[in-house]
Amino acid sequence: MKTLLLTLVVLTIACLDLGYTKTCFNDDLANPKTTELCRHSMYFCFKNSWIAGGVERIERGCSLTCPDIKYNGKYIYCCTRDNCNA
């Protein structure tokens, strides 16, 4: 009986979805290729882009909040789906 109970507990833990983890692009290339698993509290993917020295700069990753500040020509985009910050 103990073996059956232990087996059921192990199967329950193995099959239980302990939480959804978001994935976001995390590189600075125009065509992103790499992703990262966001920490549990990170709900947004973001993409920052701006022009510096005549060259477009891009930053991507996971974020706890979605900043809507656009200043000095900097564009900030946030989204909530997996890999939506291409």
From Swiss-Prot:
What is an example of a GO molecular function annotated in this UniProt entry?
toxin activity
User: Which cysteine pairs are covalently linked by disulfides here?
Assistant: C24-C45, C38-C62, C66-C78, C79-C84
Q: Which PROSITE patterns match?
A: SNAKE_TOXIN
Q: Does the keyword Disulfide bond apply?
A: yes
Keyword terms of this UniProt record: Disulfide bond, Secreted, Signal, Toxin
As recorded in UniProt, coiled-coil segments are none
Q: In which tissues is it expressed?
A: Expressed by the venom gland.
Sorted alphabetically, the Gene Ontology cellular component annotations on this record are: extracellular region
Coarse class of the protein's main subcellular location: secreted
* Signal sequence, start to end: 1-21
- Cell location: Secreted
UniProt lists the family membership as follows:
Belongs to the three-finger toxin family. Short-chain subfamily. Orphan group IX sub-subfamily.
- What is the recorded name of this protein? Candiduxin-1
| Species lineage | Eukaryota, Metazoa, Chordata, Craniata, Vertebrata
